[in-house]
Amino acid sequence: MATLRVDEIHKILRERIEQYNRKVGIENIGRVVQVGDGIARIIGLGEIMSGELVQFAEGTRGIALNLESKNVGIVLMGDGLMIQEGSFVKATGRIAQIPVSEAYLGRVVNALAKPIDGKGEIIASESRLIESPAPSIISRRSVYEPLQTGLIAIDSMIPIGRGQRELIIGDRQTGKTAVATDTILNQKGQGVICVYVAIGQRASSVAQVVTTFHEEGAMEYTIVVAEMADSPATLQYLAPYTGAALAEYFMYRERHTLIIYDDLSKQAQAYRQMSLLLRRPPGREAYPGDVFYLHSRLLERAAKLNSLLGEGSMTALPIVETQSGDVSAYIPTNVISITDGQIFLSADLFNAGIRPAINVGISVSRVGSAAQIKAMKQVAGKSKLELAQFAELQAFAQFASALDKTSQNQLARGRRLRELLKQSQANPLPVEEQIATIYTGTRGYLDSLEIEQVNKFLDELRKHLKDTKPQFQEIISSSKTFTEQAEILLKEAIQEQLERFSLQ
């Protein structure tokens, strides 16, 4: 019988001791006492931060929102159907963050930045906090560069600048999403990264928007963040912050970004649902007391950065839905007070066939002409005043039996100006063509035409100008001013087109 020598035993023991590698760690673990309706109550999580991520035993994640003396209120980032009472929950020690990279361009993702378009995983080496602080006062500079939407009514009278927050507000089915998507389509070739955030919408509506982006070649520079109507309230609440984090990634890399939140009414409703289930005290319209902060901390992240930070920008176009045109409701007034102006879409104008249905009278941009090129200021300076006078005169004309010649001419001019503001969807115009269109209307060249002929004439004029007077576009795009030479070229093109049109 073989016997082990002392040195062999010593060697075996040494090897075993060297292989022994026991890690000692402390984990913050709690237990589920109640779960349901997307909310879980946990006991035992003593040291946990507000907003910290937690991991349930069956894989679902959640965010700690209510820190109470006896328990912690967790909102679930999933349906949580498999979570059982008494199961364990582990605090991760991390605040919610998402991966970010250039690879997100052209993709459709959810509120956790996971792809939902079936095109495979997205490779990202960096990450950003979903809720990061807004740039400080010193980090910003005033808005001075225009962000062209391609819509004549906006670019001429309610201009938007890079780094601005402009609210799009109106009833349902008034074309709010169409204004936002047309703005994205118009950024093609402008070096602007676009993020479209769909919150609580029908999957068919989001699919339609994505299809439009693909058809028009806009997905190359666009990221779509989508949480549908059947998504948990937590994810609908997080989606705008995820979109903002993706846009910020590009902004801090000296790029220009545009973000659309479609729409913040749905986010507020999701937050109200979460807050009521967490037993937070309800306020006006049953919204919690911090619903203003919900939107202000999101929209304050839009900024124009100063030269030390690279002059990047993030322009936000939040959308808010009103009920029967009531802009004095809680959420609309909150967002109006946070933003730098609003574009009001009217159901009456939409039903009258004026599309985009922008009510120019009560729409405003608080940045104003600082966000316009000089050529647009020169040509469109008085158009808002003329349209306001036309609206006033039109209301008066309903009661007056006879109008003098001057008033009749003013009414005729106003009707043609309103007609030239009409644009079909997915047909944004470059700023040079907008300037030509507005000049034609404000200088009275359309007065001799029937109203039904105005848009046909303008379409043909823009084509004629592009084909025969390419120098016009070159002058405007290079000098940004409406020079005498540009005016001569435009007048020639208008006269030629009027002669051709009269022969038809």
From Swiss-Prot:
Compartments where found: Plastid, Chloroplast thylakoid membrane
Membrane topology: Peripheral membrane protein
Gene3D superfamilies (UniProt xref): 2.40.30.20, ATP synthase alpha/beta chain, C-terminal domain, P-loop containing nucleotide triphosphate hydrolases
Site annotation Required for activity: residues: S363
Keyword Ion transport: yes
GO CC field: chloroplast thylakoid membrane; proton-transporting ATP synthase complex
InterPro entries (UniProt xref): ATP_synth_asu-like_sf, ATP_synth_asu_C, ATP_synth_asu_C_sf, ATP_synth_F1_a_nt-bd_dom, ATP_synth_F1_asu, ATPase_a/bsu_AS, ATPase_F1/V1/A1_a/bsu_N, ATPase_F1/V1/A1_a/bsu_N_sf
EC top class, as a word: translocase
Superkingdom classification of source: Eukaryota
Protein residues bound to ATP: G170, D171, R172, Q173, T174, G175, K176, T177
Reaction(s) catalysed by this chain's protein: ATP + H2O + 4 H(+)(in) = ADP + phosphate + 5 H(+)(out)
E.C. number: 7.1.2.2
Keywords assigned by UniProt, alphabetized: ATP synthesis, ATP-binding, CF(1), Chloroplast, Hydrogen ion transport, Ion transport, Membrane, Nucleotide-binding, Plastid, Thylakoid, Translocase, Transport
Molecular function GO labels: ADP binding; ATP binding; proton-transporting ATP synthase activity, rotational mechanism
PROSITE patterns noted in UniProt: ATPASE_ALPHA_BETA
Complex and partners: F-type ATPases have 2 components, CF(1) - the catalytic core - and CF(0) - the membrane proton channel. CF(1) has five subunits: alpha(3), beta(3), gamma(1), delta(1), epsilon(1). CF(0) has four main subunits: a, b, b' and c.
Family: Belongs to the ATPase alpha/beta chains family.
Cited function: Produces ATP from ADP in the presence of a proton gradient across the membrane. The alpha chain is a regulatory subunit.
HAMAP family attached to this UniProt entry: ATP_synth_alpha_bact
NCBIfam families cross-referenced by the UniProt entry: atpA, PRK13343.1
Protein name: ATP synthase subunit alpha, chloroplastic
Organism of origin: Hordeum vulgare (Barley)
